[in-house]
Amino acid sequence: MSNIDKQALREEFQYMQDHYSDPADRARQVIYIAAEALLDELDKKQQYIKLRDQEDEDIALTVGKLRVELEAAKKRMTEQSAIVAAAEKLVRCKGRYHSELNYRALAKLFGVITPDLPPLEHENVHYADAAEVEITALRQRIQELEAKLETDDKLQDGAFRDGLKAGFSYGQTDDQSGFTQCMSAYSTRAGIKVKGE
């Protein structure tokens, strides 16, 4: 119903109450009173609906504001992650040129995890011990290989000289055959294989 219809009905109700006070028209008065009560109830419900609509608009505005704030927060997080990535690169770069303690301090300052760093001496004593044992083993292996190389060089030099002597003593002009014979004799004692065998 439009406001004009409601207003006309209300005027009709008022006119009836003023002019029809006859008990014979009592049934008609009850109907008009009930209709007026229904109109009042309808007005209350429409006001309630308007109030709810206003609350819905307020909620929609609040949700819109929260979305804008969320987008701004996401943008800030993206910017900060870029800053953290740059800081991590700085920390890794600084780690190449400065001491390990400075590198760790920068990493801690920017919250960068550095799993590639070995622990410091006070963090893990066993790491230094294991490294020392490995270094000692490598040095020993190097000495063994150098000694074997010297022995092989001496053996080859001796075999060559003896091959020359043998070649001259047999009257051979091909010195290589004497070298091969002497090398095979020496190598069986030293456990070395000759290419010719």
Curated annotation (Swiss-Prot):
To phage lambda protein EA22. It comes from Salmonella phage P22 (Bacteriophage P22). This is Ead protein. It holds the Pfam family Ead_Ea22.
